Regions:
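Flavin (primarily FAD) cofactor-binding/catalytic cores of flavoenzymes
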Residues: 1-54, 116-664
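Redox-cofactor-proximal catalytic regions of oxidoreductases
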Residues: 42-111, 618
Length: 665
């Protein structure tokens, strides 16, 4: 009889759950005997970020129709077990509402109300998504094939090593001292705590010296929001998604209410409870992420993707021996699509924005975009737009992400008025959906991210381009535009600002400790007003996803043993390599399929194995998820329901490749 293979999966959140699901499905087909040890101090399925006991005010950043941990039939070669087949979050949600699916434990009334209020386009509470993940895990566990067994260890993995002479090649140690033997180890670690940056350490030290309160970056569900005082100034650094979570807890979470504005259907009115702190927020761009447009699906149905396609990138690969560059090869194609979709919608909805007939303009624009004349196309578009489009209606992509860059304000009140006007316009655009040119340009960027993830994973770009162009420049730009919250959050922020609950510092603020006055001080160089002083400062951001800064006994000990290392990237000739944020792994980012004569996009998913200190590939230690940020981009984005494996479901395809590799040993 073939011996049983033992697999330790470290991390029981979505990526670890995918590993379990794929191992189970593959083992059911091959009849291989497998024992899975699932290790995580948090509950299996939901894990840390999606745990089911968190506030229902914390929302996902994707609508109900988007996320899944189960690939559609036919996507991965071997379908999931029958009990979970095709079970995306949206299908699970509908099943719970109509009574055909029973949650693992009974929903309380608040959960039931939240679930029944959702539509496929609404953004669900994270705790409700955790309920889905919990159900998937429990259903898998209850219907394991006879050749598969599973043990859950509610503990932290703290070490792993190679056992040269033992029956099983590896051992994984848990907090408390238990050691688990393994033939293979899957690192699906998810979000980890991280060491603070030097400036943050200075704030910690200053707070300790003067009795101030400083909250470092954390997962929002872990923060003790009730500790923040009523009616005192609280500085908040960061205006991304965690900022929305902070606002929800400090307003609705304290009894405040939002109601429709009877005089303006696009606005809300906030009724304070009196228990709110005085929130003063700041970030580099000075504004929150732009709201997502209201669409009938995740992508705009009328969006035209003409230039940045897998076929176009394939042509680049087939006609050049050079490694791709983001700035030279990919970004121009992405910009072309954004320009085309912006002006196409502008011509349809606002023909008076053109000095010449809108149809004539589009024909000229089309000709320029189709002409492969290198970098000159951009200057030609700029000249055409300058001559043909009314000022104020021209697309300025960089200004979209930083609307107040290099703009001076005389007071906080003046800046707040400008921000509220900006928020109202953003809400108006989101509610127009596919009739808004700006939102369609942003939707084009959002669609490009899916194609870009495939290109980067399968073809790759140069190290210098990865570090300096993709991660440093493009990533913050596109996140501020395409990774924004639901429009409800921007409506709420505008209402809170009108109610005087929230104020803004301005772009590029500095946060320091004034040791003479014994308080935090924050000010923006672009707003000429008295600096804001406070005894409370919170970082509205999650810990950095960076293996060199992450606090993980497991990774630290594996690094000391030489089993893992961070990936180094060569950014320019003769310069010292820089450390990237992810682990070094063995799967090449440039896949060569010799049967087809070269790299063929859309055909590759990978079983990523760790690379150790001496360039040695460890054959039985695999990586899934966030720690792959050196070879994949957008690693925190969930798998997309009903998407092809090489596009929106790549995380599931990678888990499938890992399962195949493990069972083939």
């Amino acid at each position: 009889m073939v011996s049983q293979r033992r697999v330790v999966v470290v991390g029981a959140g979505p990526r670890g759950l995918s590993a379990v699901e794929r191992l189970t499905a593959r083992a059911a087909q091959t009849r291989a005997r497998v024992h899975i040890d699932l290790v995580d101090p948090f509950p299996p399925g939901a894990g840390h970020v999606w745990r089911t006991d968190q506030s229902l005010l914390f929302l996902m950043n994707t609508p109900s129709l988007f996320p899944t941990v189960i690939a559609p039939d036919g996507a991965l070669g071997v379908d999931p077990l029958a009990e979970v087949r095709n079970m995306s979050f949206e299908r699970w949600r509908r099943g719970v509402v109509d009574g055909s699916i029973t949650p693992v434990s009974a929903l309380d009334q608040a959960e039931r109300d939240a679930l029944e209020a959702l539509t496929s386009q609404d953004f669900p509470p994270r705790a409700i998504y955790g309920r889905y993940l919990e159900w998937i895990y429990t259903t898998l566990n209850n219907h394991l094939p006879s050749n598969v067994t599973l043990t859950v260890h509610r503990a932290e993995a703290v070490d792993a090593w190679v056992q040269e002479e033992a029956r099983h090649r590896y051992a994984v140690e848990l907090a408390g001292g238990q050691s688990i033997p393994a033939d293979a180890v899957v690192l699906a670690l998810g979000h980890l705590d991280a060491h603070l940056r030097p400036g943050q350490k200075e704030l910690v030290d200053g707070a300790a010296e003067h009795g101030l309160t400083y909250w470092p970056p954390t997962v929002p569900a872990d923060a003790p929001w009730a500790d923040l005082p009523e009616q005192e100034t609280v500085l908040v650094r960061g205006m991304g998604l965690n900022f929305c979570d902070a606002l929800a807890q400090l307003t609705e979470g304290r009894g405040g209410t939002f109601e429709p504005d009877k005089n303006n259907p696009e606005r809300l009115i906030y009724r304070p409870s009196g228990k709110e702190p005085h929130i003063v927020a700041g970030s580099r761009r000075g504004t929150p992420y732009r709201a997502k447009p209201q669409l009938k699906g995740y992508y705009a149905h009328t969006l035209e993707t003409r230039f940045f396609t897998l076929e176009a990138v394939q042509n680049l690969l087939d006609t050049s021996s050079e490694q791709l560059s983001f700035e030279r090869d990919l970004w121009p194609l992405i910009r072309k699509d954004a320009n085309w979709n912006y002006y196409r919608v502008l011509a349809r909805t606002s023909p008076d924005a053109f000095i010449e007939p809108a149809g004539d303009f589009l024909r000229k624009l089309d000709a320029i975009l189709l002409d492969n004349d290198g970098a000159r196309w951009s200057q030609r578009v700029e000249a055409l737009v300058s001559a043909s489009v009314v000022p104020g209606r021209q697309l300025q992509q960089e200004r979209l992400a930083r609307p107040f860059e290099d703009v001076n304000f005389d007071s906080h009140d003046e800046y707040a008025a400008a921000v509220v006007h900006y928020l109202d316009r953003d809400v108006h655009g989101s509610l127009r959906g596919e009739d808004d040119p700006v939102k369609m340009a942003i939707s084009s960027l959002n669609a490009a991210r899916t194609v870009l993830k495939c290109v980067l994973a399968e073809a790759g770009i140069s190290d210098s381009s990865w570090v300096n162009e993709l991660r440093r420049d493009f990533e913050p730009f596109v996140e501020g535009l395409a990774s924004g919250p639901p429009v409800l959050r921007i409506q709420q922020l505008a209402a809170l600002t009108r109610a005087g609950v929230v104020r803004f510092l301005g772009p590029e603020p500095r946060f320091v400790v004034d040791r003479n006055e014994g308080c935090f001080v924050a000010a923006s160089p672009w707003v000429s007003d008295t600096p804001v002083r406070a005894r409370w400062l919170i970082e509205a951001m999650s810990p950095a996803n960076d293996v060199h800064r992450n606090i993980s006994p497991l990774l630290s000990n594996m690094h000391e043993r030489g089993l893992v290392r961070g990936k180094l990237m060569e950014t320019r000739d003769g310069a010292s390599p820089v450390t990237s944020t992810g682990l070094d792994v063995s799967a090449s980012a440039r896949r060569v399929d010799t049967a087809l004569g070269g790299l063929k996009l859309g055909t590759g998913a990978f079983a990523y194995r760790v690379v150790g200190q001496k360039d040695a590939v460890e054959p039985g230690i695999f990586v899934l998820g966030l720690q792959l940020s050196s070879v994949q981009w957008g690693v925190s984005i969930a798998a997309e329901a009903d998407s092809p494996a090489h596009l929106g479901a790549r995380t599931l395809a990678d888990a499938d490749q890992v399962a195949q590799a493990i069972l083939a040993e």
